[in-house]
Amino acid sequence: MRAILLFYMYYAVTKGGLGMSQTTAASIMSIYGSLVYLSTLVGGWLSDRVWGSRKTVFYGGVLIMLGHIVLALPAGVTVLYRSIALIVVGTGLLKPNVSDMVGGLYSVEDPRRDAGFSIFVFGINLGSIIAPWLVPWAAQGFGVHIFGSQLNFHAGFSLAAVGMFFGLVQYVLGGKKYLSTESLTPNDPIDKGDLLNVIKWVVIIIIAIVAILAAMAGVGQLSVDNVITLLTILAIALPIYYFVMMFRSSKVTKIELGIHLLPVSLKNRLFFKKGYKRLKQIIQLELAIKRQSFIILIALIIMASILIPNKVIIAKHLLKLVLLVFYWIGLNLIPFSTFVLSFLFLDYIKHMFKKEGEQAKKTKEKSRIHHGIEIPLFLRQLIINIFTLIILEGETLFDENGVEVNIAEHPVQGYTELNINLLNKDSIDLWADWIQSVAKYLLNIMYTADVIVIIIFYLVKMAALWWAWSYIPLSTVFVGYKYSGKDESLQAALEVL
């Protein structure tokens, strides 16, 4: 929906769009994306204090459906902002609470709990694969071009409304059978007096915002850029207020404070300049399809590993099959950087399937801290290698066995043996002496910086471990170690490249 909404805003009117400039359309999308994540704070509070997660998710789904119905109406800019407002509020109600509904299907000890979340993620990404095909098909006239040469974006928006309608029907019918009655009530119901006080402050804030917007309009400063600035201030102030309330509340336990840093990730979502760059990724639907395909493969393998008896043996065989498929995708379709980073994630998933105690035997206590810096050091090495490969592309060198190798045709040696000493080999004929000097200088700087980087990561890791053992449940620390373990097959993966 976000991709087609962007096109809808800046396509010419003659092509079925609104005729906005690309800058304005991108700015509106940034506002939309930021408000979605800000609204989740409100949705979580309403679920915990007023309605309960089950009702909150339902209300959110209804508002999202209504927002897409409004978008499906060919009323131009008049209804655009109203529909976005409905979708923002609806997403804020649904997004933070729907995962809670999935978790409520099973007890904490039930081994099917993780598989349930994998099915949930599988369904989301399955929809992400279907949508880039189905929406253009509808916009172009359902395969028979009933709209002529124009794109009918409203037909695409209507599909989202129809999908949400059937989702709500299934949610209501299935909820009566599978969802617990506890989800119908809030976890920490608010007193009537406190609720009235909250409503009073909400009304005051809304009036203040309207007054600010009216004042900006009065002096001719009501523009998209200025609205973004206003929202940026709000995006900074609201999380700070949220943290203050969390730390001051007597209802928040020490363990719950252990995950208080999670909302900090909001800053990456709410930084508008980064948000503008993210829009370019939205437009690249083909790459999005590949990414969602990869996530579905991951979800399937995790579900299989949990639900199938003797999961270690079966999961390893299934994972090998997934790796073979992913190798083919990576070598033929996906850009190099995307493949390497995605494979790194997949390889860490592999640690979930190791026999109990296998990793512990190979990991010494004193080296655990070092494992946490595997990813940043690997990425740094990757940058060095790519930089060196660019310099040496097409040139000849000899591998460790004395066999002549062309870097462009056989990059394996470039990734397994490249280091600063490689540039000193007589067999390398660089394009010019000054390139060699610059390369040596830059690479020496990066290698010298390793000492500082390692010291910093050791300190950060030790601080993080102390904090984790003090505040985070043991299971969370364990999972963290699972994903920060030494990557033994990374070398093999790079050889495949």
Swiss-Prot record:
SUPFAM superfamilies on file: MFS general substrate transporter (SSF103473)
Cellular component annotations (GO), alphabetically ordered: plasma membrane
PROSITE patterns: MFS (PS50850), PTR2_1 (PS01022), PTR2_2 (PS01023)
Subcellular location: Cell membrane
Keywords noted in UniProt: Cell membrane, Membrane, Peptide transport, Protein transport, Transmembrane, Transmembrane helix, Transport
Molecular function via GO: peptide transmembrane transporter activity
TM stretches of this protein: 3-23, 26-46, 57-77, 84-104, 119-139, 155-175, 199-219, 227-247, 294-314, 321-341, 372-392, 452-472
Membrane topology summary: Multi-pass membrane protein
Keyword Protein transport included in the entry's annotation: yes
Gene Ontology BP, a term: protein transport
Pfam families reported for this sequence: DUF4931_C, PTR2
InterPro entries: Dipep/tripep_permease, DUF4931_C, MFS_dom, MFS_trans_sf, MFS_Transporters, POT_fam, PTR2_symporter_CS
Source organism superkingdom: Bacteria
Principal location class: membrane
Disulfide cysteine pairs (residue numbers): none
Family according to the record: Belongs to the major facilitator superfamily. Proton-dependent oligopeptide transporter (POT/PTR) (TC 2.A.17) family.
Protein purpose: Proton-dependent uptake of di- or tri-peptides.
NCBIfam families with a match to the protein in the record: yjdL_sub1_fam
Record-given protein name: Di-/tripeptide transporter
